[in-house]
Amino acid sequence: LEQLVKKLGEATSASVVLTGVSFQEDKLGALTYDKDKNTISYFFTDRVPTMFHGTGDCFASAFFGAVVKGYSYQEAAKIACEFTYMAVKNTEPFQDKHWYGVYFESALSYLTNL
């Protein structure tokens, strides 16, 4: 993965964020490659044993919001992973009735308290 994101960064002249990274069955997270600093970072949360649509949108929104607010890519990935995890975890009890997205609103206070 590290070679892949570095090559992608070189090909696009941009930093790279890769989500859905997992090396352990019970963990899920993201990898960031900061092209300017030539650094690779990982951040993981517990994997919630279910799947919902819209988690990529939640991650991207939280990530870019954090970057705009001045956080580094590594810090933004951590924030986005934690926010997405909270949204999924809060939606898990309703998975039989709520399959089309996550209750991200329940995790917004995490972002507003940064």
Cite the ranges covered by each PLM segment.
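Short, small-residue alpha-helix embedded
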Residues: 51-73
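Short pre-catalytic strand/loop immediately N-terminal to key active-site residues, enriched for Gly-Thr
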Residues: 39-53
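Generic structural signal for well-ordered, non-membrane alpha-helical segments
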Residues: 1, 5, 52, 73, ...
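Conserved phosphate/ATP/ADP-binding segment of small-molecule kinases
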Residues: 1-40
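Phosphate-handling active-site elements
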Residues: 39-40, 66-80
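Charged C-terminal helix
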Residues: 74-114
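Glycine-rich beta-alpha junction loops
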Residues: 20-24, 46-49, 81-85
